[in-house]
Amino acid sequence: MADQAVEEVAESNKTTLGLYVWPQGAYAMWLADPQHVHLLDVRTFEEYVFGGHVEFAKNVPLVFPRFNPEGPAMPGRPPGCSGELNPDFVAAVQRVCPPTDTILVMCATGGRGAMAVNLLAEAGFTTVYNIVTGFEGDRVDDPGSVFHGKHMRNGWKNAGLPWGYDFHPDLMWEEPT
């Protein structure tokens, strides 16, 4: 565990490797060894582009968004909004992150990050941390707050860590040809 107690990790964000880090700890790990510590953003390309991103994070989407008005919804999403697992996910990560290096996985709030860590663990990666509050952080749960329901608690963006909208082509997702 890089910086906080495992008991504080939401059940949906837990992984088979049991390696967790909060955004501040993840940033410190990357600063200490940027050649061997990789930040992997597994959000969709659209989230990465339009929601902002950590400008040194490699984007490899775990899922691709799909809409089918007759289909099921992903948890917490409107009816018909679902996702299809990226069939090239593990191979794409293998192309950008050596399996002997440390990988810090980020999604929006930690759930997809946990799924990504588990897939990478199954593929033989051993030092993969889930950034448990992700890029956006948890929702404010206070009906009296103007921020009720908004992702304004914790997370990379809310911790005041560096992020932006600039693009670095070598870090962005490219579909295999």
Predicted stretch roles:
Residues M1-V37, F45-T102, G113-T177:
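Rhodanese-like catalytic fold shared by cysteine-dependent sulfurtransferases
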Residues D41:
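N-terminal glycine-rich beta->alpha transition that marks the start or flank
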Residues V105-M106:
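Short, surface-exposed ligand- or partner-binding patches at beta-edge/loop junctions that are enriched
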Residues G110:
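Conserved G/P- and acidic residue-centered "switch" motifs that form tight phosphate/ATP-binding loops
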